[in-house]
Amino acid sequence: MSVIVPVYNAEHCVSDCVESILAQTYVNLEVLLIDDGSTDNTLDLLNRIASKDSRVRVLTKHNGGVSSARNLGLDNALGDFFGFVDADDTVEPDMFEVLLSACLDTGSEVACCGFNRESRESRFSACRKDGTPSLMNREEFLLGVITGSKDGRLI
């Protein structure tokens, strides 16, 4: 499984993000950190992170936005499944194990989960009440994206 993280000027938060990915209960991960032309010290930090864990690869590109960074990750990913995490996010320790197991157990091509948005002032949850992932094939997922009815984290 490949986890793709687009990164732009995120030296203040990307370490927490990557630590949460590397601490997953599912350990057969490839983590692709895509530096999207950062102008701060992000790239140096990403290279230090990669030097400590062989599962991490750093790719660089000129700034082109999150979609082009994700596409570069997809072009270089080795996994059979792909997950996307933003550089300012952290993930639950079993997130990818739960999502991947759900896909494999049901033959689904896509699994989405909710998310919690937290700040010092508030917390917002967009998770299903039973905590299970949403499962669908690619056509259902694309229709949901087009109509705006699908949101959350996915593999």
Task: Locate the predicted segments by residue.
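Nucleotide-sugar donor-binding/catalytic module of glycosyltransferases
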Residues: 1-155
